[in-house]
Regions:
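Formylglycine-dependent sulfatase
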Residues: 2-8, 13, 20-432
């Protein structure tokens, strides 16, 4: 830690990051969606999606327009976020499911997560929504996504929650119109279903948390992890679908050679899902706005860091890919918006290539805990970019795709501002360079 600190001070001697510890500790509201592409913000003008609340958040803070996910798959991305370490080191080399469970794929209980550090420093902590960092084990939880060849959903016991003392969450579950949850004290077999769209219910719970579960004289950190716009695109309230019923989908395909032709499998996959994908985003946006408005109403926003991001994007048919576990822009690029009225200059775009996992050291630094970042953290501390406007366009971010059954297999890559270089290996032997 001393080496990390000295390098930071030499590089940015006038940056106010280290003045924060003597002031009031900021609150943190960390909101993430699942599978939200980086270009899909109305304020960017690149995709015809309506996101007025996030556009306002971008105006009130920093919009990282070149943000990426280094391993664009749910569990590995979340594992890197929570630990600040890359997959080979944090052991989350693939999605947490029964197929990968024999290889130890889950968030280690002894990992030092950023939430552990905040809890140790007196923060009240809450987690709402999708977690997806525990390996399913027999007898499997009785949910629809545990009845096939691979089980996906799992409860997280208190000792594995890494400092979060309020809990309304689930492992992974994609039926968005009737989601399921475990509450803080619920045992493994006592989950419940809600007849309400997931993001709406999770915003309700966030508002309830802000009003009834915290001492407002003490700092708090709340994560709200919304599953849409993850697949199950059609599982969104009709009022959001109505907003896109007249969208000219063919116009979106113009001058896009990466989108296959109409009548092909992947071309039709894109055309059949893009309206509902945008509808999910608009619904998530509206519910994020509800949370932010409640922070304002309670007088908490001024000293609250609000983050919006996503674990990864999605190809949705582009490049002949339905999914996200690939190095293309649609998969790797994500939104990262950060506001803090007391400290962060509004209406600021940054081109520094921040990664999803860089939020661990970056947020701890701007919150005043830079000296407590563990030595094993591997990701970039970009607090200077947030607080001082020190762009760093020389950052090179890694790219991963790993077969958990054989970690020497899969893709490895490097991404610069202009290029992505990847290699594919089978049993440790390189067989493809891209």
């Amino acid at each position: 830690m001393k080496k990390r600190l000295n390098i930071f001070l030499l590089a940015f001697p006038l940056c106010p990051v280290f003045q924060i510890q003597a002031q009031e500790k900021p609150n943190l509201v960390f909101i993430m969606a699942d599978q939200w592409r980086g270009d899909a913000l109305g304020c960017l003008g690149k995709e015809p999606v309506k996101t007025p609340c996030l556009d306002q958040l971008a105006r009130e803070g920093v919009n990282f327009t070149n943000a990426v996910s280094s391993y664009p798959v749910s569990s590995p991305a979340r594992g890197m976020l929570m630990t600040g370490m890359y997959p080979h080191k944090n052991k989350v080399t693939g999605n947490c499911n029964s197929a990968n469970a024999p290889y130890g794929v889950e968030l280690p209980q002894d990992a030092r997560c950023w939430s552990d550090i905040l809890k140790a420093n007196g923060y009240q902590t809450g987690y709402i929504g999708k977690w997806h960092l525990d390996a399913p084990h027999e007898p499997y939880i009785d949910t629809y996504n545990n009845h096939g060849a691979v089980a996906w959903n799992e409860w997280c016991p208190k000792e594995r929650r890494h400092g979060f003392d309020y809990w309304t969450a689930y492992g992974t579950y994609d039926y968005h119109l009737k989601p399921m949850y475990w509450d803080t004290d619920a045992p493994r077999d006592s989950f419940y279903y809600v007849n309400q769209w997931g993001p709406e219910y999770e915003a309700d719970k966030a508002i309830e948390y802000l009003n009834g579960h915290i001492d407002k004289t003490q700092p708090f950190a709340l994560v709200v992890s919304m599953n849409p716009p993850h697949t199950g695109y059609e599982l969104v309230p009709d009022r959001y679908k109505e907003m896109y019923k007249n969208l000219n989908v063919e116009a979106l395909c113009t001058n896009r050679p990466d989108i296959p032709a109409k009548g092909t499998e992947m071309g039709d996959y894109f055309r059949n899902n893009i309206r509902n994908y945008y509808a999910c985003m608009t619904g998530v946006d509206e519910n994020i706005g509800r949370i932010i408005n409640e922070l304002k109403r309670l007088g908490l926003l001024k000293n609250t860091i609000v983050v919006f991001t996503s674990d990864h994007g999605i190809c949705m048919g582009a490049h002949e890919q339905a999914g996200k576990d690939i190095f293309y822009e649609e998969s790797m690029r994500i939104p990262v918006l950060i506001s803090w009225p007391e400290k962060i200059k509004p209406k600021t775009d940054r081109t520094t290539m921040i990664a999803f996992a860089d939020l661990y050291p970056t947020l701890l630094s701007i919150m005043g805990f830079q000296q407590q970042i563990p030595e094993e953290v591997q990701t970039f501390d970009l607090a200077s970019v947030l607080l001082c406007g020190k762009e760093n366009n020389r950052i090179v971010q890694p790219y991963y795709y790993i077969q958990s059954s054989n970690p020497a297999t899969g893709y490895r890559g490097l991404r610069t501002d202009t290029h992505t270089f990847t290699i594919h290996a089978t049993d440790g032997k390189v067989d493809k360079i891209i």
